[in-house]
């Protein structure tokens, strides 16, 4: 509804693994009716140990049955933040791999060989580090050929409890948000230089990815 998403760019449905197939159908039906962008189901965050891998397999069994029961949603895609252990165990099942930044060319080749969409995220960039933010969203993403990138968080209070933001809102001036690219102030949310550099990096990426104009006939 906000028009901030465009066709061809999947939106991640965080928390899809917290509900079941009945809710999946309700939300996906709504998405089709209202012509939303594609929703990719986020199933089991960071499956890097056996317990998480086993839970992901349980969720994929549900997803497989869901696609059989509701063929109109048979093309729904799955995703998660994933590393080498998770890819080895489950890479063939996830449609979109969201890998931590810093991976090498072998992962790019593996994703292409397995016909997977490769995205990246980073939680090590600093809001005061303009150069690295610009490089990550610009040259690095273009050079690797990945199709999506993101910071860990625009603003992260540190946990997911219902009261997580209370301390921040009660003292915005003296609260520092870790892994965040915004500074909450009493009058507004103030973006640091790192956030401005993200925008520059995106502009550079667009420039690099745009084919040059052909010479006139």
Locate each region found by the language model.
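The substrate-binding groove and active-site-proximal loops of carbohydrate-active enzymes
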Residues: 10-19, 40-53, 94-100, 121-132
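A general structural detector for well-ordered alpha-helical segments in enzyme core domains, enriched
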Residues: 23-30, 55-63, 107, 136-140
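Catalytic domains of carbohydrate-active enzymes that cleave complex glycans
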Residues: 1-50, 61-85, 161-217
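Eukaryote-skewed repeat-based solenoidal scaffolds used as protein-protein interaction platforms
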Residues: 46, 54-119, 124
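Catalytic-core region of carbohydrate-active enzymes that cleave or remodel glycosidic bonds
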Residues: 91, 96-174
């Amino acid at each position: 509804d906000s028009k901030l998403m465009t066709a061809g760019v999947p939106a991640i449905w965080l928390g899809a693994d917290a509900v079941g197939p009945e809710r999946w159908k309700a939300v996906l039906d709504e998405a089709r009716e209202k012509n939303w962008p594609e929703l990719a189901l986020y199933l089991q965050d960071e499956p890097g140990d056996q317990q998480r891998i086993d839970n992901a397999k349980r969720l994929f069994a549900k997803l497989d049955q869901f696609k059989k029961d509701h063929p109109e949603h048979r093309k729904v895609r799955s995703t998660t933040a994933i590393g080498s252990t998770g890819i080895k165990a489950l890479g063939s099942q996830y449609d979109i791999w969201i890998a931590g930044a810093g991976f090498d060319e072998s992962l790019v080749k593996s994703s292409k060989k397995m016909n997977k969409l490769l995205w990246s995220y980073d939680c090590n960039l600093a809001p005061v580090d303009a150069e690295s933010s610009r490089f990550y969203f610009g040259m690095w993403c273009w050079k690797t050929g990945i199709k999506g990138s993101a910071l860990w968080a625009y603003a992260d209070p540190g946990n997911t409890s219902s009261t997580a933001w209370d301390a921040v809102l009660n003292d915005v001036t003296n609260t520092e948000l870790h892994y965040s690219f915004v500074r909450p102030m009493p009058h507004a949310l103030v973006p640091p230089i790192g956030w401005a550099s993200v925008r520059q990096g995106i502009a550079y990426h667009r420039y690099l990815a745009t084919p040059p104009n052909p010479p006139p006939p």
